[in-house]
């Protein structure tokens, strides 16, 4: 298995194509509150796209007014006048069922929206009228399409290829929802890249000369508008087969909090301002019942919070908050910190979880780097400095643009139009995935019972892209197996509720018995299920096949060196065709190429342990192996359908 190779030339990108009309590529860092766009085009190695207001970031907001769509700052202006038709923070609803706690929390915080259940998908829809509804994927698709229009205007040429950032804790359903949104906007997604990985790549590329054979462990602490994620990354030069010594980053540990971010502070300050207005008794009405007024207060709360990061106090003021009544009140930094005390108590948890998952101690971390706009809050920095025990926190990358720039490096690497230097990226899957199945076994008293089996497909923090094969040794007739998330006990009870169903899909195999009957003279080598986790962290079931072997006698003069020749026949269920096993579709375990540091990683040690237990697994009825990554990955042949 080869690690994902990300390549980039710091000062020069060589254009391979003579056609410069449509070779630009883009990245979109789609946060909950802000969107950042970057491009690479001939003559412009990397650049952040300016929006129509010449700003480097654009509010993630859409206003749907009759036959007109407004985006960004224009949409925010509409939010004050008509909050019901201005949509924000809808990414929180991607890939989630209507009964998810995140959906309930969204409804409570933003009562101006009417959410209804999509009876077909069991997800949610925004209802504008009896005839008009929009899904979160459709809204995200509109925003992505707008991002492309900004990129094309800035690049002065068509742009179709894109790398999109997603939170590292996005599960399979959430990632597929982002892909669906991109398809609606007619964008070609080169890759979904985890935003923490994009940040780490951006940091490493600009420090390429500082990376050597000695491992450097860097902790990135990112607090954005909606969530917080802490990532431990190891940078090191490694020897590759084709390119000699090259820099590599490896994701070693990850900790996160889905609901710890700047918007939580804004909402608490908004409610505090509403309380102050009611206490002034300038109106007999409760301002909290007025959606337009609450929208104004949320906007003002965000502004005041930002100013309080540099000042001890500030005056909140809104003209015509409600019924032409002006509002003015003094807010201190201490008041804000008191309002958010329980939030600040959660600052340290992602650090501890990242260290635990990496099996590292804080003393092994060389530097802590701040990322994300909410890390500018003084209290966050104070608490973080205390928990990491460092003299200072690193602020030497652009906290707002690092993810967008890292993603656009990857876009240039994946594009056929640009030639760039190698930078190896070994990303890690946060959530383990396993295969579960039930088979009939015979007890000592000759009675029969059903035995439930589990086989880990991808460990927690397993590197990807990666292929795996599960071999079912004891089935001769039709059967089914489930693909589920593995042990998630490291998540809290609230996180598990938000996570949703642990079942990804159930695969039912037909034609197994018929295949065995047709090849009764052959020796079965099991039924092999081929899985692929691609560069976007998406799991697919490529194919399932029955493998048979026949023994052919050789000529006497050859018996001294070869007495038997194995002839493998693979029967693909559904098609029933026989496919010889070749290097391209090999299902046996293949040793990985030596592209990693001399000291084995956690994942490699686990793989060695798995190999040692291979015989034990066969007794259970399955074995799992890796497949060799041969150049470009095969095109996905089939995808499991969700129940």
From Swiss-Prot:
Superkingdom, taxonomy of origin: Eukaryota
Record localization: Endoplasmic reticulum lumen
Main localisation: endoplasmic reticulum
Name of the protein described by the UniProt record: Hypoxia up-regulated protein 1
Disordered, as annotated region: 565-643
Signal peptide as annotated in the record: 1-22
Record Pfam families: HSP70
Name of the coding gene: hyou1
Species of origin: Xenopus tropicalis
SUPFAM superfamilies: Actin-like ATPase domain (SSF53067)
Molecular function GO terms recorded: ATP binding; ATP-dependent protein folding chaperone
Biased composition range(s): Acidic residues: 590-610
